[in-house]
Amino acid sequence: RICYSHKASLPRATKTCVENSCYKMFIRTSPDYISDRGCGCPTAMWPYQTACCKGDRCNK
């Protein structure tokens, strides 16, 4: 799986993962502000929320 791994406003970067999913993490009240991206599907703590997906570069 190829997932985006860049933080919020940094230039796009990808990484090859062994996990079969990608995620993006954002603040629940500001879903347009992505605070983190990467491989897998981690559990988020309030006020963050995780959106997980299963496809190459799906966590745009």
From Swiss-Prot:
It is found in: Secreted. Keywords: Calcium channel impairing toxin, Cardiotoxin, Disulfide bond, Ion channel impairing toxin, Secreted, Toxin, Voltage-gated calcium channel impairing toxin. One of its GO terms (cellular component) is extracellular region. GO terms for molecular function: calcium channel regulator activity; toxin activity. CDD domains: TFP_snake_toxin. InterPro entries: Snake_3FTx (IPR003571), Snake_toxin-like_sf (IPR045860), Snake_toxin_con_site (IPR018354), Toxin_cobra-type (IPR054131). It comes from the Eukaryota. Disulfide bonds join C3-C22, C17-C39, C41-C52, C53-C58. The keyword Coiled coil does not apply. Residues 41-48 are annotated as: Important for binding to L-type calcium channels. Pfam families: Toxin_cobra-type. The keyword Transmembrane does not apply. Expressed by the venom gland. This specific blocker of the L-type calcium channel (Cav1/CACNA1) is a smooth muscle relaxant and an inhibitor of cardiac contractions. Belongs to the three-finger toxin family. Short-chain subfamily. L-type calcium blocker sub-subfamily. This is Toxin C10S2C2. It comes from Dendroaspis angusticeps (Eastern green mamba).
